[in-house]
């Protein structure tokens, strides 16, 4: 798997120890939430309306590519509502009892955040339906003919589900969310503001041009931007005086093999394979996976989304095609 050694992979277990730093620099209020203006403006209205009625916020589904701030937004919502948040994930909730234990410990208007909600088991999902709709918990007591169902009333609460695969949610679950928000890849000016804010939180000396250089190569993803910032900081402290300007950021990121478009060696390997081995395509996923020695799921979920979003790769019914922009980037004649 390539995730373990990709600095620009949005989800990389190798960087879990940096979650503590990420939590320290995450915004706590909607006013500090950079980018995603449509989401921020809508959530501000929904939250204020719920507060005016003294009600729990409607259940909220947040979806989009990894690293765009779904967990951050969930925590901001709880903070703005002035309530507690309990966090879990779909794979952790193996049994109905696991979910029941969380639900029965919620206080009025609290937030329950379930990351990777598309990975809930059908058994757990069935328990969630009446909890979301009627604030009730249906529990089976006993087994066989003696089994009986009892109902437990729950306080009003807000379920916030996060997923990178909204299409994998079942219709009954998806339809029970009153609010749905899609997070998009960030624009460079918004990422620059995020990098500058993170640098200030970390006490770094950073010029606006240095923040811009990091933002350009962060693939539209705040998580990657903050990770690159930390590595640029290391470079500046060892090779310079700790001050980060555009030149320092450029040298650091080139050393890390992250080019001007945010591509690393795996992105280049994939695009070059299509252009040089398959004449630019179309090429099927199986052939492409064999050509670069990577799993199909990794290509589809990790490598392709950004390349497609930026216009370097196309998915067609006949296979993948490298675009004119890809040829231009590598200086290869078509």
Curated annotation (Swiss-Prot):
GO terms for biological process: DNA recombination; DNA repair. One of its GO terms (cellular component) is cytoplasm. Its main location: cytoplasm. DNA binds at residues 315, 320. It catalyses: ATP + H2O = ADP + phosphate + H(+). Residues 260-334 are annotated as: Head domain (RuvB-H). Mg(2+) binds at residue 71. Its EC number is 3.6.4.-. One of its GO terms (molecular function) is four-way junction DNA binding. Residues 187-257 are annotated as: Small ATPAse domain (RuvB-S). Pfam families: AAA_lid_4, RuvB_C, RuvB_N. Belongs to the RuvB family. The RuvA-RuvB-RuvC complex processes Holliday junction (HJ) DNA during genetic recombination and DNA repair, while the RuvA-RuvB complex plays an important role in the rescue of blocked DNA replication forks via replication fork reversal (RFR). RuvA specifically binds to HJ cruciform DNA, conferring on it an open structure. The RuvB hexamer acts as an ATP-dependent pump, pulling dsDNA into and through the RuvAB complex. RuvB forms 2 homohexamers on either side of HJ DNA bound by 1 or 2 RuvA tetramers; 4 subunits per hexamer contact DNA at a time. Homohexamer. Forms an RuvA(8)-RuvB(12)-Holliday junction (HJ) complex. HJ DNA is sandwiched between 2 RuvA tetramers; dsDNA enters through RuvA and exits via RuvB. An RuvB hexamer assembles on each DNA strand where it exits the tetramer. Each RuvB hexamer is contacted by two RuvA subunits (via domain III) on 2 adjacent RuvB subunits; this complex drives branch migration. In the full resolvosome a probable DNA-RuvA(4)-RuvB(12)-RuvC(2) complex forms which resolves the HJ. This is Holliday junction branch migration complex subunit RuvB. It comes from Vibrio vulnificus (strain YJ016). The gene is ruvB.
